[in-house]
Amino acid sequence: MKNHLNNNEDNSTLIKKKVLFVIAHPDDECMFFTPTIQHYNFIGSEIFVACLSNGNAVGLGKIREKELIDSCIDMGINQENVFFDQTNNFQDGMNIIWDTDLVEKTILSFIKQTSADIVISFDECGISSHPNHISISNGLKQLMKNKSSSTTTTSTTSSSSSSSSLSNRTTNNLNKEIKAYKLETVNIIRKYIGIADIPLTKLLSYDENSTQTFISTQLFPPSSYSPMTKHKSQFVWFRYLFVFLSRYSFINTLIEIK
């Protein structure tokens, strides 16, 4: 089902964890994160999916919510572990940038709701350069930065300023052991050579202390195909091509957010 390319993987990742995937839209979970979800399913972790937008750009939000739930069930994720933001702060759109502080606050609320040990989402390029993906990356990065800062702050500093940001206040109660990872964006050639990107990944030099790589060895159809079929409103011809040609159907490289 999966292989590890990182032979020096932290032993803590082999222990059952509560893993939270933060995505922007329904179908992100299977288009991009299938190999990682497979890995954590394989080792018996409890998996949660938090979706900030229901993909309502053309009025299909409720349909797409149901599709995400069906896709997650297909991937072995409990329906009760699939969450949507209910604030309407995050509208789906290629020209919409989400507020970083709001994203951070929302991710934090999902972390507390799920008691997650690990949070996984997009990197700063968002795989497809989608601004909603990048907005999540910015919010998660800020959350982890503020968490790190809070560990070095003494209790006396809490009275130094009454105007401290929401970010710095809310991270004080965050589990200090939590880890966050971003899914690496690769160049367009590697993105669309599918399984052929595996040997290239092996050849590339990564920091094995902060990088994990997961591989799905299911080739035809790719393991992302079945859950993607649940997204009937989105499964048009070019997404068929993506599922079969994208390296993200077969391989995920995760980089720890320090």
From Swiss-Prot:
Catalytic reaction list: a 6-(N-acetyl-alpha-D-glucosaminyl)-1-(1,2-diacyl-sn-glycero-3-phospho)-1D-myo-inositol + H2O = a 6-(alpha-D-glucosaminyl)-1-(1,2-diacyl-sn-glycero-3-phospho)-1D-myo-inositol + acetate
GO process terms (BP): GPI anchor biosynthetic process
Compositionally biased tracts (Low complexity): 148-170
Coiled-coil blocks: none
Enzyme class: hydrolase
Cellular compartments annotated: Endoplasmic reticulum membrane
GO annotations of cellular component type: endoplasmic reticulum; endoplasmic reticulum membrane
SUPFAM superfamilies: LmbE-like
Chain segments carrying region Disordered: 147-170
Enzyme Commission identifier(s): 3.5.1.89
Pathway: Glycolipid biosynthesis; glycosylphosphatidylinositol-anchor biosynthesis
Paired cysteines (S-S): none
Pfam families named in the record: PIG-L
Protein keywords: Endoplasmic reticulum, GPI-anchor biosynthesis, Hydrolase, Membrane
GO terms assigned for molecular function: N-acetylglucosaminylphosphatidylinositol deacetylase activity
Family indicated by similarity: Belongs to the PIGL family.
Function: Involved in the second step of GPI biosynthesis. De-N-acetylation of N-acetylglucosaminyl-phosphatidylinositol.
Name of the protein in question: Probable N-acetylglucosaminyl-phosphatidylinositol de-N-acetylase
Organism expressing this protein natively: Dictyostelium discoideum
Upper lineage: Eukaryota, Amoebozoa, Evosea, Eumycetozoa, Dictyostelia
Gene: pigl
